[in-house]
Amino acid sequence: MTQYFDEQPTVPSDRRIVVWALPDGPLTITTDRGVFGHGTVDAGTKLLLLKAPTPPQPGALLDLGCGTGAIALTMARRAPASTVWAIDINARARDLCRANAQRNEIDNVTVAHPDEVPDTLRFAAIWSNPPIRVGKDALHDLLLRWLPRLRPAAQAHLVVQKHLGADSLQRWLIDHDLPTERIATGAGFRVLRACPADHSPAGHDS
């Protein structure tokens, strides 16, 4: 089966629309096969968006592994003076995220392949429902690539399913100079808040 972390999904398209009522207004999302969250907004994403604090603004924000864009669009709506970078290696996901931003009339989202993000860009916040099923080594590489790019005192909020290793991931982050605490639990998921130590090289945030 084609996985949602493939660059070019080969599974036939089957687009479905989801309307999700959030406290700050409804969000209409087109989903598709080959992209995480087909036909639904998953419970982990819901928990993250209900429990994460309002994103800072102005500045650059990051949705790591954007999928259909539910997280990125919510960040953008809550922080209209910020620019949200929605990144994913999956080309179908990027297309959906762009279309969903347009559908919801949200214009402060930049959708990109991870390699298109400027090396000097630093983020005021990162939100992510990371691709746990990509494998432990690949996941660790992903987090070590992006979390150190937070601005000083900035935070990352990650949602991870408990039975897929949320607690062990928290310990691993702490062991890698990424102090992390659990801020919420629900529906079998944990929301983790990571506040990396200030060792990032200088960069810009817009």
Model-derived regions, located:
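Conserved SAM/SAH cofactor-binding pocket of Class I
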Residues: 43-128
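General small-molecule cofactor/ligand-binding pocket signal
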Residues: 30, 110-112, 181-183
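Conserved class I S-adenosyl-L-methionine
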Residues: 161-176
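Conserved beta-strand signature within the Rossmann-like core of class I S-adenosyl-L-methionine
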Residues: 153-160
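A short glycine-rich, Lys/Arg-flanked "PGG" loop and its adjoining helix->strand segment in the class I
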Residues: 140-152
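Glycine-rich phosphate-binding "P-loop"
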Residues: 125-137
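Core SAM-dependent methyltransferase catalytic element
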Residues: 185-206
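N-terminal auxiliary segments of SAM/dcSAM-dependent transferases
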Residues: 1-22, 34, 38
